Amino acid sequence: MIQSTGVTHTDKSAQENPVKYRDNFTPVIITGMSGAGLSTAARVLEDLGWYVAHNIPPQIILELIDMCAREDSPVDKVAVVCDVRSREFRGSLTQVVSELRDKQLDPTVLFLEARDEVLIKRFDNVRRTHPLQGSQTLQVGIERERTVLSPVKEDASVVIDTSDLSVHDLRRAIESSFRTIATRTQHVTIESFGFKHGSPRDADFVVDVRFLPNPFWVPELRPFRGVDKPVSDYVLSQKGAEEFLNNFVDMLKDMLPGYRHEGKNFITIGVGCTGGHHRSVAVSEELAKRIADQTTLDVSVVHRDINRH
């Protein structure tokens, strides 16, 4: 007997000839908020050579991935897109992920989200209704979806907030993440931001560099940004900057073995200052250089608010 979820085999021949899965097979499940960029994520993975199945109900995901993972399967990389348009979504996706892990087919769950006001604007732009709004408002539909997806997000391998990302930014973020999956390395994203615009929602931890003097108050530096050498030299030469950078990199190196043991291959560090133009940008760039030089991590840098007013 084979059931869609909670697969149970009572077939004697199956017991005598256990299924053989290919080595290093890592399936991907793409999910998240409607309007957050699931279709873009799917296209990126297709361009990277993944076989992508769209809008697959959770009860079918287990069977599809099991089939693709077998040694005799012609598909070596598979990703499935699963969203709340599937009536069976509620509660069942987390169950499927758990069952895949029990079968040693540990999936990478990519979860995309965005702020409510951003999602509302995106839906308004394309003149579409939300799949869960029914006869209610768009805001109600988004709130319902966030509640449904909360346990999925908590268990996700990679969470990307697309609120402030262009399509090209999202593509780069996904490409970087999935190169990491292919090579089995750990990846750290350093994201500079301005506290006045809010902290990154997908950061694992946040660093506040407002203890450093603000170049904004130096007239000749104000027009520049933290990626420019005059600002970078000013920020990094301030008292406490060198000590902070050394201590932070040392702390991260101490944490890496624990992260690796827990299977956490994606680490996001938010580095914040007031506006996200000067101090956080300069410190993020320098942190990225030092982490790349002193660890085996793949490193990428995102300056979320560098052009934001």
Swiss-Prot record:
An example molecular function term from Gene Ontology annotations: GTP binding
Coiled-coil boundaries: none
SUPFAM superfamilies registered for this protein in UniProt: P-loop containing nucleoside triphosphate hydrolases
Keyword Nucleotide-binding recorded: yes
Keywords in alphabetical order: ATP-binding, GTP-binding, Nucleotide-binding
Residue sites binding GTP per the record: 83-86
The keyword Zinc belongs to this UniProt entry's keyword annotation: no
Protein origin, superkingdom: Bacteria
Binding site for ATP: 32-39
InterPro entries listed in its UniProt record: P-loop_NTPase, RapZ-like, RapZ-like_N, RapZ_C
Job description of the protein: Displays ATPase and GTPase activities.
NCBIfam families: PRK05416.1 (NF003828)
Family: Belongs to the RapZ-like family.
Name assigned to this protein: Nucleotide-binding protein Cgl1591/cg1794
Native organism taxonomy: Bacteria, Bacillati, Actinomycetota, Actinomycetes, Mycobacteriales
